[in-house]
Amino acid sequence: MAAHILKDVVAYVEVWSSNGTENYSKTFTTQLVDMGAKVSKTFNKQVTHVIFKDGYQSTWDKAQKRGVKLVSVLWVEKCRTAGAHIDESLFPAINTNEHLPSLIKKKRKCMQPKDFNFKTPENDKRFQKKFEKMAKELQRQKTSLDDDVPILLFESSGSLTYSPTIKINSSHHSAMEKRLQEMKEKRENLSPSSSQMIQQSHDNPSNSLCEAPLNISRDTLCSDESFAGGVHSSFDDLCGNSGCGNQERKLGGSINDIESDMCISSLVLKANNIHSSPSFTHLDKSSPQKFLSNLSKEEINLQRNIAGKIVTPDQKQAAGMSQETFEEKYRLSPTLSSTKGHLLIRSRPSSSSVKRQRVSHGSHSPSKGKSKRKRSIRRSIMPRLQLCRSEGSLQHVAGPALKALSCGESSYDDYFSPDNLKERNSENLPPTSQLPSSLAQFSCRSLSKKERTSIFEMSDFSCIGKKTRTVDITSFTAKTISSPQKTANGEGRATLSCVTSEESSAPGETLRCCRQAGKEDACPEGNGFSYTIEDPPFPKGHDGDLTPLEGSLEEVKEAVGLKSTQNKGTTSKISNSSEGEAQSEHEPCFIVDCNMETSTEEKENLPGGYGGSVKNRPTRHDLLDDSCDSFKDLIKPHEELKKSGRGKKPTRTLVMTSMPSEKQNVVIQVVDKLKGFSIAPDVCETTTHVLSGKPLRTLNVLLGIARGCWVLSYDWVLWSLELGHWISEEPFELSNHFPAAPLCRSECHLSAGPYRGTLFADQPVMFVSPASSPPVAKLCELVHLCGGRVSQVPRQASIVIGPYSGKKKATVKYLSEKWVLDSIIQHKVCASENYLLPQR
């Protein structure tokens, strides 16, 4: 019978916690369903009852407008316990948000985890509509398909089939079928292995003239290590072909593209060296050392040809032929241009960090080499084979090329380094001007990381992110050559722009790398540092060793101990170049200190356009001292502001009691807006106002009365918000419920010093029992604030407050805690006879 007591009820449940974060509707929904009621998920016209607690204001308004019965959760509980339909008027719902101002709307956010239900067309209406729409669209496409349109189908095995709906004697359809059949037959050979390619090259040597053009644009380039064989891709790198590897072969779509890629290697070999018998396409997979030895010798011969030492008539003839053939076959791949009869191939890579501007010229002749150098040769051979365009002939490079192999490799490890960034854009720059023939032009590779670090050590980093400026790197030039020599006027300048942070390295490693590279070390056009130096006289017997700087230890100590008091614009002179070098080597530590102590604004205020040399510019110590002084000046006003007391929290505090969380949030927002108060959880010596949501006798209200605070209603805050400032408190004082509040407040205002009441001043010494409620500390504080005296031991007291389990004396009064509370509320000592505890 209990299952049908609410059979005529259609309920809509909206039950939330008072703070609006917990939704308890599901519990009461279950109870209503158990009693036979129907529960609606939406507030529709069939709803007869709304179970409401701390719900939305819109639900409340809609229910009142429709005349639906608004009941509290107690009605549901009473119906369940009584087993009958209880009258709804006995349990009306209460809307606590009805008096809140409409301008403050708090968005509810339920913190409870939702039950995850997998969406299906059966339980989700939106998903069902979407599913039906897709089914209709699919059916429409099937019906609208013309009968004469052939269909291409992909079977489960992955093969492509041609399925015409009706047989049409059309040449187009038969051609399509024939073409698809050819593709299916060739499918097994779309990605041949290296051995298959070598076999095809042996079977059909006439294909070495590359009859099939490459269909690969220069935007579809692949990385340098995409081809596992390494034989063809590494040599294609030498020829400037950046689009090699498996990806390139897949893009072609047929075997002709693969043969075309294979032919490039043999074509270049035949064009550059007609007498070269072994071609790279004829190499076996089992002979990597032979391949590497060929590559090493060809690299050396190529260097010698670039230097203009060995060029045979056959090679000159082959160079002309290669240029003509390459321009014909490479229309879609790397950009080709020739300068004064020399071939220049430039490719623009998209992602590889190794492939840069590439130039191929000269002859290749096989010889022996080492297998372990395969990777380093592949990664660093082309940067040293670059040719720069000039009016006369190729720029000459002094010294062997293989010496700089290890140093040259590091320059291209970081694709996003400043020099590589400029190298990628260098093809848009104008060609460099002719330089004096007496100077050795460094134009074969970029600076390595260690060399860049050495220059960074002597650079002023205060202008990072600003416009470019020019600095003199005379001392760096001297360090690179291990002999302090001065450059010609204007020739020792370098443009320092877009400086990025690099890992600092030891000065010895920097010098060793620069010295090992010898005179080949230089950078291409626009690489960030382009400079020339004189050919220094190296002392005999010191091919790779370095002489330590004399007296460097003492000079470093002097540099570290130096404290300059000059301004930013002044310069400090250094007596000799060794001292300048020692200072430069130890500058990074000062940079770190400066970065730690200097703010961003101070970095921007440091001199950014200073163009003096390393020797003449202000030392790092000057900049450090000046910037730190400026930083101290910058923070002085903040320290003075703290000392002066401005910016402190307000001295007055406001305490809320008997107030739900929604109203507390409103009070906090109003206090933040109108200022003048800070919120405190409990009444203390700084409290001046106590806000009570309901006229209940709480500890905060009692402590507020005892301290002479304003005890106000919640409306005072709302009216203050309405008027935009704190208004008078008297109209909102709860004097009817707490008559002692205005009396104690008046006494507090009239007292000269700290206020202390006189209510219990004439009473004997009291002892508060540890088992009392409110807690002992709060009760003792109340008695003390009202002028009473509290003892720590019961034998000294004449009045014992609270339950006492010890031996009782006839001369001592044992009173309830309510005696203290009622006396404070009424502001008079109540008769003790009404509060005596029973004697046991």
From Swiss-Prot:
It holds the Pfam family PTCB-BRCT. Its main location: cytoplasm. Residues 355-378 have a biased composition (Basic residues). Coiled coil: none annotated. SUPFAM superfamilies: BRCT domain (SSF52113). Interacts with CDC27 and maybe other components of the APC/C complex. Interacts with histone variant H2AX under DNA damage conditions. This is Microcephalin. It comes from Hylobates lar.
